[in-house]
Amino acid sequence: MSMRIGNETFKQAVKTELKDDFMRGAVSSAQDRLRERKLKTQEDLGNWEEWRDHSEEIRQHTLANLDYYLNMLSENVAAKGGHVFFAETAEEANQYVQKVLRDKNAKKVAKSKSMVTEEIGLNEAMEAVGCEVIETDLGEYILQVDDHNPPSHIVVPALHLNKEQIEKVFKEKLGYDKSSQPEELALFARQKLREEFLSADVGVTGCNFGVAESGSFSLVTNEGNARMVTTLPKTQITVMGMERLVPTHEELEVLVSMLTRSAVGQKLTSYVTTLTGPRAEDEIDGPEEFHLIIVDNGRSKILGTQFQSILQCIRCAACVNVCPVYRQTGGHSYGSIYPGPIGAVLSPLLGGYDTYKELPYASTLCGACTEACPVKIPLHDLLLEHRRVIVEEEHMSPVAERLVMKGFAQGASHSTLFKYGTKAAPALMSPFENKDKGMITKGPKPLQAWTNSRDFPMPDDENFRDWMQNRLKRGAK
């Protein structure tokens, strides 16, 4: 899988997703549940806004000194016996991993959940050199067994499937013969995955945060699979987006606390693991060889721009969990492994406007995402800035839209045109009026996008100017 999901545009995908009542119900239920849990743990923490301010300061400071902390991280990883590779592109990262796999004659890779590896299409690259890749996060494992069904949520990848659908997948693909009870499904998956952990040659993980002062990296999970991936295979590969680091363990403590509360509404996840390099001589477990791949893949081009604050993201999906557009369309409609508001901002920056120019418009600009963000990214402002760039700099807005807006600007800028335009509007729109409703129920382009889902009011026969003049003639003040 790579960053792009499917071949449909956002508008095309939305038409399909809006008809999927189960998906919309599942997303709504999950959003409500996750949001309520987040609010509860926020209250338990107390002074939530102060924690947000502090988290924002940590992320802004780190980004402002990113070269310094990346250098510190790489030096400390190397000092602990690890190997560090800076990958400018997805291709460079994948080629490095392929080389490690070939050198180790690896046949099986156990992998924990990672958005950056999805972004660069690492699974396909590993399979291309003859490796069997096993996703060990339960949600990702379900999707992999289900013919590589793409994830629909950053934190809960199989959000769009219910337990009956998962039972069917396990029965058809793995010979499962028990019920659809979540406990039995999870136990079955656990037994299957235990075999994979024990036979894997290489373990691959993402990274929630790298810690510059010690050369460590942290993994936050509820299932414990990341610990298995990082302790059983002899070779360990960690892939990290270049912005995903903190200066010290003190900052790590703050951001992990914010991450777990914002992502799943927990004070702390079941497992918070911090690992540092390969195993030492006096240690009995852990990898014999450790590789850290630091991925740029377009991130350095965001630094120093008006979009830099998006790199503060800690991948908690709090913005996704409050987004009204995601609530109705689900994750697959975005065509990116990054859905919701974070995806609508980040995807055009990493994947380009040619592919993702629709996503900044997949927003009501209500600002709920900005209010939910634990590191105070101004998401709705960034979406507006994307729209400005698309129209003013990239000139990529639809031709019909440009013509309509140009015509409106002309009319609104000249009083005579505006006067006669408003007088003529009722007559011009009359052929499209539904006489029974007194509304336009099926309008011409570009009104069709509106009238396909709601009615459009008919212009009043008496415009405001005429109404005001008549009122003044009657002596009204």
UniProtKB/Swiss-Prot annotation:
Q: Name one GO molecular function term.
A: 4 iron, 4 sulfur cluster binding
The GO annotation for biological process reads: lactate metabolic process
Region Disordered: start-end pairs: 443-463
Q: Does the keyword Iron-sulfur apply?
A: yes
Q: Which residues form the 4Fe-4S ferredoxin-type domain?
A: 304-334, 353-382
Instruction: Identify the PROSITE patterns for this entry.
Output: 4FE4S_FER_1
In terms of superkingdom, the source organism counts as Bacteria
- Cite the binding residues for [4Fe-4S] cluster 1: C313, C316, C319, C373
Instruction: Give me the residues that bind [4Fe-4S] cluster 2, please.
Output: C323, C366, C369
What the entry lists under InterPro entries is as follows: 4Fe4S_Fe-S-bd, 4Fe4S_Fe_S_CS, FTHF_cligase-like_sf, Helical_ferredxn, LUD_dom, LutB, LutB/LldF, LutB_C
List keywords of the entry alphabetically. 4Fe-4S, Electron transport, Iron, Iron-sulfur, Metal-binding, Repeat, Transport
Q: Where is the signal peptide?
A: none
Protein family: Belongs to the LutB/YkgF family.
Checking PANTHER family in the record gives: LACTATE UTILIZATION PROTEIN B
Protein task:
Is involved in L-lactate degradation and allows cells to grow with lactate as the sole carbon source. Has probably a role as an electron transporter during oxidation of L-lactate.
Q: Which HAMAP family match?
A: LutB
Q: What is this protein called?
A: Lactate utilization protein B
Its gene is lutB
